[in-house]
A protein has these predicted regions:
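S-adenosylmethionine
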Residues: 1-431
Length: 431
């Protein structure tokens, strides 16, 4: 266990110093090349779990220490161990013993004794500490909801009826949802295939299948052959809301990693241009399309400045955002984001919207999409755009009865729940 704790502590420490977990975790794993697959898997679980509940775990650690430690790695090791003692099924004695061993490997002479003392104090005083945290107005909400205070305050203001449920969803494990390629099968048939292979799943309409337990894509029947793709249920709305028709010219303006790109091509025979400003990420789009045996014109470019001689009938603008609606998938986001980042994203989004509008044909439709739950990036952004473009009209989102039943949507905002992430959709038509 101590190897997994050590790897997780390296990853958590790097995230708390500003690194993205998608970069920090592989780097931490690479520092222990002899770790077994089980140790590597456990390290990933501990990294995600510690950051998912960092607000709570850190509140306990602050109460246990007289002052913050100067050693970031030992701090992170304590955070990982306290997370285990609070949320993991591992035996308390084993967690403490292995954390002390990990501290010894980390080399500071004082580390073993301090880690041992802090963790044993935690076990003795856990109930008292919980009451102290609950009574401390400076940290009680951050500890209870494991989100930054500014984030909690914003959700209280913008979602007075839903803020607690949104925060709870943000701390939950995300579902694994598949999109069935309608050219090859449908959700009901595919669920029957899964049942024959003892994989429990639920179909959420014609295309979406939610697995009871996540599995590796290598174990997903038909994935390699393009029968299914991994895509959140809420994200599957994008291609459907575009109102696609045969032979249309389509621009997917922020295409990587290509989930929505592939979905568009599954639904209609169209001429699609996939644009992204990152060439390496565009390679992922190419890989996705190859698996689906679909073709698009892939272009590297910035959606805020991109020019094209073509006027497009449909444009998908899945713009950069705070990603506040997908924090359960990216647990580091809530601790890396700052409230000031919202305004920076809004400037970028406005520039993209304004530029793409020039590429849209008359009577064409542009679907504006974010994976954010902050209104500044969503309807407020659209309202500002509409004030400046009198040839733009926001259309109602037309959902099928099946989608209406399963999707929790409020004025274009998908409120994150156990079935789907938090996304925003606005469909704009050019007159």
């Amino acid at each position: 266990m101590y190897i997994s704790q050590q790897i997780a502590a390296i990853a958590v420490s790097n995230v708390l110093s500003g690194r993205n977990l998608t970069l920090a975790l592989p780097e931490a794993l690479n520092s222990y090349p002899k770790a077994t697959p089980q140790q590597r898997g456990a390290a990933a679980d501990l990294s995600y779990g510690t950051l998912r509940f960092y607000g709570e775990v850190n509140a306990y650690l602050e109460k246990l220490l007289e002052k913050p430690l100067s050693n970031a790695h030992i701090t992170a090791l304590l955070l990982v161990a306290i997370y285990q003692l609070l949320h993991d099924k591992a035996d308390d004695f084993t967690v403490v013993n292995q954390a002390v061993k990990a501290a010894g490997d980390a080399k500071p002479r004082w580390a073993k004794g301090l880690v041992n003392g802090v963790l044993r104090n935690f076990l003795r005083q856990k109930d008292v500490l919980a009451e102290q945290i609950k009574a401390d107005p400076k940290i009680n909400e951050v500890a209870l909801y494991s989100h930054p205070q500014w984030w909690i305050n914003k959700l209280k203001n913008q979602y007075p009826q839903h803020w607690q449920a949104i925060l709870a969803t943000g701390n939950a494990h995300p579902p694994m949802t598949l999109r069935v390629n309608v050219q090859q099968s449908n959700a009901q048939e595919y669920c029957q295939l899964l049942a024959r292979q003892d994989i429990e799943a639920t179909h959420l309409g014609d295309q979406a299948v939610m697995l009871a337990k996540p599995i590796s894509v290598e174990q997903v029947p038909g994935f390699a052959d393009g029968v299914v793709s991994v895509q959140d249920y809420g994200a599957q709305l994008a291609a459907q809301l575009l109102d696609l028709q045969e032979n249309m010219r389509i621009l997917d303006a922020c295409a990587a990693p290509g989930g929505k790109t592939g979905h568009i091509l599954e639904l209609a025979d169209v001429a699609l241009t996939a644009l992204d400003n990152d060439a390496s990420r565009l390679n992922r789009v190419a890989s996705n399309l190859a698996r689906l045996q679909k073709v698009a014109d892939l272009k590297v470019g910035d959606a805020a400045t991109y020019k094209d001689n073509t006027q497009f009938d449909r444009i998908l603008a899945d713009v950069p955002c705070t990603a506040s609606g997908i924090v359960r998938r990216h647990v580091d986001i809530k601790w890396l984001r700052r409230e000031a980042d919202i305004a920076k994203f809004c400037v970028q989004q406005a520039a993209i919207l304004s530029n793409l509008w020039q590429l849209l044909a008359k009577d064409g439709k542009l679907l504006y999409v974010t994976c954010s739950i902050f209104n500044e990036e969503n309807q407020q952004q659209v309202d500002q755009f509409l004030l400046k473009h009198n040839d733009a009209t926001q259309l109602p989102l037309l959902l099928t009865n099946e989608l209406e039943k399963n999707i929790q949507i409020q004025h274009g905002q998908l409120i994150p729940n156990h079935q789907h992430d938090g996304l925003f959709y606005a469909l704009l038509q050019k007159s």
